Amino acid sequence: MDTVNNYRVLEHKAAGHDGTLTDGDGLLIFKPAFPQELEFYKAIQVRDVSRRKSSADGDAPLCSWMPTYLGVLNEGAKIEQSGDAALLKIDERLSDSTDNLDSIPVKSEKSKQYLVLENLLYGFSKPNILDIKLGKTLYDSKASLEKRERMKRVSETTTSGSLGFRICGMKIQKNPSVLNQLSLEYYEEEADSDYIFINKLYGRSRTDQNVSDAIELYFNNPHLSDARKHQLKKTFLKRLQLFYNTMLEEEVRMISSSLLFIYEGDPERWELLNDVDKLMRDDFIDDDDDDDDNDDDDDDDAEGSSEGPKDKKTTGSLSSMSLIDFAHSEITPGKGYDENVIEGVETLLDIFMKF
């Protein structure tokens, strides 16, 4: 790998902060790091890494909904591996992807820190993305008075306050019937692309009465059959039910976190996978406990063997739902589940049950 040319702005994004980068293969993303988000990722992943896969009773640990955290990258420096043994094993498995990450191109004298995360879009051919921000309360105790007042107004005047969630943005394949439903202020057409970006103004303009129509719009893909669209909605309903159960067991507080919906809009990939979707994302890295029996396979890892990052184009999912954005999240032992998040998930469940 070269250095500068291997980092580019993340192409597909429905909302969020500017400055998110990806590597040349699109396997990883590099997201500007906030101290609280970094600590949350480390704490959750260290706690849950041994039970990342769904347990026998069907529950899923919180980390199974989150992008895999791989470490920290400083501008002008190589990846800084975690000292935690559980994470170190994952870091070592990714050596082929990270050993040559010499630096992120520096654009200012002040060095930045980046979270190194699994790219949730990796493996999708034509991803369609929906970002749903959870919660009625949109600020934490550290927010300034000005931000508190501003976020209160946003909550009070949008579905955040009434329903516990708000559509933050979408990036979907162009569809004439969708464009006919949208005012020009709500979307941008990308030049030389078959995508449109639906901005936050659209989400803020939705009401209790029409927000379900906005979610229907997300699934209104001109390249997929009605049967495939119906399958997607039912699969996301199952995910929401499972995620709801996860959050009832978690003692955390998450402000302005989002659910990221992704589905495949390329019918050829649907055919390649025989329309078979997976409820949960595959582990980013296979974690085989019998490593000692597979020492002879070490040389194959660099070529994408079963113990390296998977070829998700042929083995991955046709859709996924993930929890993202933890700059204002923390573990809160003894305080019970997060009602601020639970209320929004309950409303989403009601909507998807009616599809």
UniProtKB/Swiss-Prot annotation:
Interacts with ARG80 and MCM1. Belongs to the inositol phosphokinase (IPK) family. Inositol phosphate kinase with both monophosphoinositol and diphosphoinositol polyphosphate synthase activities. Able to phosphorylate inositol 1,4,5-trisphosphate (Ins(1,4,5)P3) on both the carbon-3 and carbon-6 positions to synthesize inositol 1,3,4,5-tetrakisphosphate (Ins(1,3,4,5)P4) and inositol 1,4,5,6-tetrakisphosphate (Ins(1,4,5,6)P4), and then to subsequently phosphorylate and convert either isomer of InsP4 to inositol 1,3,4,5,6-pentakisphosphate (Ins(1,3,4,5,6)P5). The modification N-acetylmethionine is found at residue 1. GO terms for molecular function: 1-phosphatidylinositol-3-kinase activity; 1-phosphatidylinositol-4,5-bisphosphate 3-kinase activity; ATP binding; inositol-1,3,4,5,6-pentakisphosphate kinase activity; inositol-1,3,4,5-tetrakisphosphate 6-kinase activity; inositol-1,4,5,6-tetrakisphosphate 3-kinase activity; inositol-1,4,5-trisphosphate 3-kinase activity; inositol-1,4,5-trisphosphate 6-kinase activity. GO terms for biological process: arginine metabolic process; inositol phosphate biosynthetic process; macroautophagy; negative regulation of transcription by RNA polymerase II; phosphatidylinositol phosphate biosynthetic process; positive regulation of transcription by RNA polymerase II; protein stabilization; regulation of arginine metabolic process. Its EC number is 2.7.1.127, 2.7.1.151. It catalyses: 1D-myo-inositol 1,4,5-trisphosphate + 2 ATP = 1D-myo-inositol 1,3,4,5,6-pentakisphosphate + 2 ADP + 2 H(+); 1D-myo-inositol 1,4,5-trisphosphate + ATP = 1D-myo-inositol 1,4,5,6-tetrakisphosphate + ADP + H(+); 1D-myo-inositol 1,4,5-trisphosphate + ATP = 1D-myo-inositol 1,3,4,5-tetrakisphosphate + ADP + H(+); 1D-myo-inositol 1,4,5,6-tetrakisphosphate + ATP = 1D-myo-inositol 1,3,4,5,6-pentakisphosphate + ADP + H(+). The modification Phosphoserine is found at residue 97. Residues 284-317 are annotated as: Disordered. This is Inositol polyphosphate multikinase.
